């Protein structure tokens, strides 16, 4: 009987060991690039970002030719993990989506919110959740404390963004209550939106919360955050529809750097709340 118990115990331990090996944490395998992602072997991948979207992508203050930021660092970590050669492709934010859908850019990796409409053009790998911030001049001259108190204000929003949708929705709500509507101005890139607030042409610029907080922290005499909205939206890196190898390489790499806390370390470096990380997941529709 004792020998039977011992044998059973040994078998269970052996099976547990096999299970533990099977569930081992993912690891980087750059030497297996051609085996795992054959269409990427020998290629240099272009990573699209707007260098005026801090803290996600921005010029290094010590070296103008160097681009840094949380999304830039994530892209480097993930692509290095897979052994993929890559380079940054810099441009205005609103132009990077059509450039990616058209194949001029391989990955759009710069604070890109997921929407079903965008997923008709691009495939996503999610890694972060989002919140929206409202940037205004220091002192908040119009005393705007929420989007609901914005009737009669002028808003600057990114062209084609979820913030544009939110501003239009509130404009309609204001008018339905017989209040002045919201004047909506769209901007093609972050720098243009910031100038609208700085010059006083816009009372509020709506954009990502981390961007707003970074601008306010770096320029406290010029800007402040009027309010924030927890949106529930997810943010991801995106590729042209059907580019399965690249999509899988991004997902696999993100799983590795999330498992070993590299992503949280990058977030901490750029003062992004660690709770904004979400498990890597592919979305194609």
Where are these regions (language model features)?
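Bilobed "Venus flytrap"/periplasmic-binding protein-like clamshell domains
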Residues: 51-54, 64-80, 112, 133-189, ...
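A ligand-binding cleft/hinge motif common to bilobed small-molecule-binding domains
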Residues: 94-98, 111-120, 166-170, 196-231
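Periplasmic-binding protein-like
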Residues: 129-136, 213, 217-255, 272-285
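Ligand-binding clefts/hinges and TM-proximal coupling segments of bilobed small-molecule sensing domains
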Residues: 25-35, 85, 162-182, 225, ...
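Short helix-initiation/N-cap motifs at beta->coil->alpha
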Residues: 70-72, 87-98, 142, 183-195, ...
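Extracytoplasmic small-molecule ligand-binding "clamshell" domains
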Residues: 25-111
């Amino acid at each position: 009987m004792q020998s039977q118990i011992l044998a059973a115990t040994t078998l269970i331990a052996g099976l547990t060991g096999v299970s533990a090996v099977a569930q081992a944490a993912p690891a980087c395998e750059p030497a297996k690039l051609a085996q795992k992602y054959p269409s990427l072997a020998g290629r240099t991948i272009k990573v699209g970002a707007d260098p005026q979207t801090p803290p996600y992508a921005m010029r290094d203050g010590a070296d103008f030719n160097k681009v840094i930021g949380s999304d830039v660092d994530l892209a480097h970590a993930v692509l290095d993990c897979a052994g993929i050669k890559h380079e940054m492709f810099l441009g205005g934010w609103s132009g990077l989506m059509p450039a990616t859908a058209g194949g001029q850019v391989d990955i759009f990796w710069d604070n890109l919110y997921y929407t079903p409409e965008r997923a008709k053009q691009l495939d996503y790998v999610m890694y972060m959740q989002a919140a929206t911030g409202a940037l205004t001049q220091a002192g908040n001259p119009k005393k705007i404390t929420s989007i609901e108190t914005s009737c009669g204000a002028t808003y600057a929003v990114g062209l084609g963004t979820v913030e544009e949708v939110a501003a239009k929705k509130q404009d309609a709500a204001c008018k339905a209550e017989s209040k002045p509507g919201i004047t909506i101005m769209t901007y093609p890139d972050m720098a243009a939106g910031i100038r609208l607030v700085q010059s006083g042409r816009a009372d509020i610029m709506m954009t990502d919360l981390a961007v707003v907080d970074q601008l306010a922290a770096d320029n406290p005499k010029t800007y402040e955050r009027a309010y924030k909205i927890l949106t529930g939206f997810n943010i991801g890196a995106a590729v042209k529809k059907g580019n399965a190898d690249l999509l899988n390489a991004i997902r696999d790499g993100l799983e590795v750097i999330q498992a070993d806390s590299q992503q949280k370390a990058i977030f901490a470096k750029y003062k992004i709340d660690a709770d904004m990380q979400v498990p890597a997941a592919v979305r194609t529709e």
